[in-house]
Amino acid sequence: MHLERSVQSQLTESKEIARPYSLWGISLAQHSFKTSTRSTGKKRSKGSTSQDGKKQESLESRNDLGPTIVGLIRKILSYSSKKEFSNLTGLESGGSSPPFSLAVSK
């Protein structure tokens, strides 16, 4: 009975950890799919005869992906600062974390 409980708690913990990463992966995949279909639609309408049109298109698709990558990095940093790097925030509030203090003293 006790063994089943511990396995169950481990499963729920791993699900909680994996949930945000899977959500980011899905949103990123949806976004890349949207941009790819959008860019092919532009190519069909323009016919892509001139080189200027091609350059403009590549810049537009690059600008579409920029905010997503920035948002992704912000989400990862906010999640990691809450979970893994709590010792760094503890250092600011007066607590001490051995690995960080060693790196600073050197």
Curated annotation (Swiss-Prot):
Ranges of biased composition (kind: Basic and acidic residues): 52-63
Keywords: Mitochondrion
Protein name: Uncharacterized mitochondrial protein AtMg00890
Feature: compositional bias, Polar residues: 87-99
Stretches for region Disordered: 33-64, 87-106
Note: A stretch of 270 kb of the mitochondrial genome is duplicated within the centromere of chromosome 2 resulting in the duplication of the gene. The expression of this duplicated gene is not demonstrated.
Localization annotation: Mitochondrion
GO cellular component, one term: mitochondrion
The organism's place on the tree of life at top rank: Eukaryota
UniProt entry tagged with the keyword Mitochondrion: yes
